[in-house]
């Protein structure tokens, strides 16, 4: 005859198998959903300074400041399998020293139950926009893109890029002002 521990082990193993199958079923129902939505980005102000970079050699580096607006309706992304979204605004540009530079300028976490409609006006960069040299001065093609990671309850962590981006030129001169 089977002991109590043997029966408990069988019940636990069966329950674990059923839970794994249900979790996989939950994942597969939303795995192929398109999570891209239109995004409107508008840059209202760009300022460029040449400052000492205290993180590396004692050379002067470009420091950019951007004021921007974001408009997006993220409601269609949220379903029963989405726990939260990690949004981030990144700048992508090339210089003579580096073919590709990518810098995260701003981020935000949108939880399930929060307002999924973004109407952000006159936002400033959350993180410093340093270039490792003088590659921002006069750069005519700095592209800002809003992207997000979908954090699901079950399944993979997809990286999605919004269907709107904006390319902005940086000024040819440095600002002398003390504040932003």
From Swiss-Prot:
Q: Which residues lie on this side of the membrane: Cytoplasmic?
A: 1-11
Name the membrane topology term: Single-pass type II membrane protein
Q: What cellular component GO annotations does this protein have? A: endoplasmic reticulum; endoplasmic reticulum membrane; signal peptidase complex
Function description: Essential component of the signal peptidase complex (SPC) which catalyzes the cleavage of N-terminal signal sequences from nascent proteins as they are translocated into the lumen of the endoplasmic reticulum. Essential for the SPC catalytic activity, possibly by stabilizing and positioning the active center of the complex close to the lumenal surface.
User: Domain of life, per the record?
Assistant: Eukaryota
User: Which ranges sit in the Lumenal compartment?
Assistant: 33-180
List the gene name: SPCS3
Provide the transmembrane region boundaries.
Answer: 12-32
Q: Which UniProt keywords apply?
A: Endoplasmic reticulum, Glycoprotein, Membrane, Signal-anchor, Transmembrane, Transmembrane helix
Q: What is its main location?
A: endoplasmic reticulum
Which BP terms in the Gene Ontology apply to this protein? protein targeting to ER; proteolysis; signal peptide processing; viral protein processing
* Compartment annotation: Endoplasmic reticulum membrane
State what protein this is by name. Answer: Signal peptidase complex subunit 3
Q: Which InterPro entries match?
A: SPC3
UniProt subunit comment: Component of the signal peptidase complex paralog A (SPC-A) composed of a catalytic subunit SEC11A and three accessory subunits SPCS1, SPCS2 and SPCS3. Component of the signal peptidase complex paralog C (SPC-C) composed of a catalytic subunit SEC11C and three accessory subunits SPCS1, SPCS2 and SPCS3. Within the complex, interacts with SEC11A or SEC11C and SPCS1. The complex induces a local thinning of the ER membrane which is used to measure the length of the signal peptide (SP) h-region of protein substrates.
Glycosylation site residues: 141
**Family to which the UniProt record says this protein belongs:** Belongs to the SPCS3 family.
């Amino acid at each position: 005859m089977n002991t109590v521990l043997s029966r408990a082990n069988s019940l636990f193993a069966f329950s674990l198998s059923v839970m794994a199958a249900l979790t996989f079923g939950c994942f597969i129902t939303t795995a192929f959903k398109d999570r891209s939505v239109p995004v409107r980005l508008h840059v209202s102000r760009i300022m460029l300074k040449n400052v000492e970079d205290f993180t590396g050699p004692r050379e002067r580096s470009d420091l950019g400041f951007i004021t921007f607006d974001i408009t997006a309706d993220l409601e269609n992304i949220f379903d029963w399998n989405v726990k939260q979204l990690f949004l981030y605004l990144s700048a992508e540009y090339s210089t003579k020293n580096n073919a590709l530079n990518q810098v995260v300028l701003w981020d935000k976490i949108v939880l399930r139950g929060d307002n999924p409609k973004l109407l952000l006006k006159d936002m400033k960069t959350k993180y410093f926009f340093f270039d490792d040299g003088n590659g921002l001065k006069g750069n005519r093609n700095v592209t800002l893109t809003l992207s997000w990671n979908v954090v699901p309850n079950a399944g993979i962590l997809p990286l999605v890029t919004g269907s709107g981006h904006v390319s902005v030129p940086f000024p040819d001169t440095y600002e002398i002002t003390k504040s932003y």
